[in-house]
């Protein structure tokens, strides 16, 4: 454990028993995680200067080990949180840490959590691997992450030539600037600045295990920082591996009797054949301090990355949906954290009447509007619960203080990067604890019914309800005679009453929330106009404030976003149509808007960024052969791909090209703009005409037509 004492750092060591039951707790396939397999994997990862690729093809086991050790440590020495002032109990005879407790008084250094101290690292690497090997590795897995294929090729030793690995690294703190550039990592640096001794010292100690076995340990101790932060945009997992591999080889270059080699294993999205939604860099064991991935190099992004690390004790995002389960508290008889609470929930499910809410097995999704509708007259309002499902989880598991802390912060709008952590937590609950998942769904459905009854009593009709939010109409509140200010007063009273109804429902069930956690219903907006196409597709608009909420138009590309903005600008005209003159004006406006879209598309016809869409790796496996030759650019291919469709000849089918995986200057075939425009205009005109028909009870002759095929010549 890396510990900060004043302005200095030290290392403490603890001997922690980890049960096979706990190791299996974090695994989808528990049969693959056994103590014997874990011991074998650890031995493979403890070779001086090895590539940290033992988890490649075995990431589930290593994630179980990482989470299990973190949880077991807290059982062994006492519950604690990262960056929390602590009092350490050390056995002076063995040299081992045996107890931890919060530093309660100022004299012991107590108080609020302290902040991480970051060193900014930027590292790039060139590893010349065989393109044929990369292609073969990509083809052999269910998914074709090219970053993973590169790691497989590296592990198997398929180098294109004997040219060595080139490495460039810069590490900056407030006190130190360190730089090295190696044309070959086997040779001294040809450019250098600063000294490694300014960053780290080597700490060695002898420990006594089991009362008699002596074991030597050797670790790197940072001098002025406790985490390394890298930008996802510039530092790949392979680059970090190459850097730390050199450090690992140097630290353990001399074999000493009874001194153990530190485990060196990498966890990251590159290990998944289909990539992962969040980029992260997690090393189990060496170098002994975290490497955090920030979304960019801005100060705010760095702070968000450090906050996510601190609030999850380093388990998010590496452990995904399991992270906050490993942070649950231990009861004395538990085999895994939170086991006793889980049993109590199983004993209380009769209160929730599971099985009676089968209409909404994944949470309420309903819409009373059976067809397209254009609505005006009353005020409309939209409401949404904050961190709804994790909050309901805390009704069942109120002792999970680490999850409660994140829910409280998100309720205050802090740390937006943790929103995905909460979404992942509940999304995976049905796999980790199906009874708890079904219980929470039953609770949420019961809340929706109680809430709906309450707002109906106050003259508000819910039009659409989706899981944790809803919108509807205040039938006794006409927007042409009730001011916006008065409508806000009504909406706030309605919000408060609905929230009280929700709290009343859970209280009657016998549940209560942890201190500081609330079931918060938020007013998302007040609107004068509403158009509904379906449960998940609607447009809400306020004529007075110009505020809008447009949900459901496909806007994954720049072209799609431009079309959505164009349609959004037309919908107020649709809502205002009263006679044939208005309809004529609308038709002219639509044609002008469509022509502007075409003109904008023409201006961007050669810009892949405007047309490309983010596509799952598993959905874009047909790749151009040239992509496998693009070296370190492929190390970025561990999440969704930016795909653009190109066509060389009119007679052939469009080809998907992952254009961000090619170096500049890009030499693409002709972007198949018409494929995109045809789909976009089909949706655009369909939604527009359905809204017109709903607004005017018009026949098809009133529909707007714009033959996009007439403009195909512009894009050939």
UniProtKB/Swiss-Prot annotation:
Keywords: DNA replication, Host nucleus, Transferase
GO biological process, one term: DNA replication
Annotated localization: Host nucleus
Gene Ontology MF terms: transferase activity
GO CC field: host cell nucleus
A Pfam family annotated for this UniProt entry: Herpes_HEPA
Top-level taxon: Viruses
InterPro entries xref list: HSV_HEPA (IPR004996)
Residue ranges of coiled coil: none
Free-text function comment from the UniProt entry: Component of the helicase/primase complex. Unwinds the DNA at the replication forks and generates single-stranded DNA for both leading and lagging strand synthesis. The primase synthesizes short RNA primers on the lagging strand that the polymerase presumably elongates using dNTPs. The primase-associated factor has no known catalytic activity in the complex and may serve to facilitate the formation of the replisome by directly interacting with the origin-binding protein and the polymerase.
Subunit structure: Associates with the primase and the helicase to form the helicase-primase complex. Interacts with the origin-binding protein. Interacts with the polymerase catalytic subunit.
Protein known as: DNA helicase/primase complex-associated protein
UniProt source species: Equine herpesvirus 1 (strain V592) (EHV-1)
